[in-house]
Amino acid sequence: MSKIMVTGGAGFVGSHLVHKLVEMGHDVTVIDNYSNYSENPENENARYFEMDTDELEYQFENETFDYIFHLGEYSRVESSFHDFDKVMAYNYHSFPSVLEFAKRSGAKLIYSGSSTKFADNTPAASPYAYTKAQNTELLKNYAEWYGLDYTIVYFYNVYGDYENDAT
């Protein structure tokens, strides 16, 4: 059994992941600010914290995790043009806190990259795509500098039960 943190665990992809990890017998902690949550009910066997990722070190200063699935970022491409401040806060400014927490915790970081960063062969297709591309590059460099173990996963056309119409 692994001790796993899922940021964005109340979102569409995250909530399905949480249910599967709990079903597999893992000890799961969910972090979410509930800005874009799924209708998928919370799993009673996981711990939920309503907070932003820049608060990880304060909330969990005495805990370590084996894995951190970082899904907790702003994830809407088109509306990112209208929510620039949110995109920068959720994706760009909070990400170093996730990296530092993963390093201190000794966790492997599984980062949800974005296929939109490949659009037109430029990361500047939208504010969302820009931040995802920047975070991907920062993660690669940070891992090289500090020895952080990581994997980047990419989701394409995700849909299914409990999908929120706003996403």
Question: For each of these PLM feature ranges, what is it?
Answer:
Residues 121, 161-167:
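Short beta-loop-alpha junction of Rossmann-like oxidoreductase domains
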Residues 1-158:
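N-terminal Rossmann-like NAD(P)+-binding domain of SDR-like oxidoreductases, especially those catalyzing
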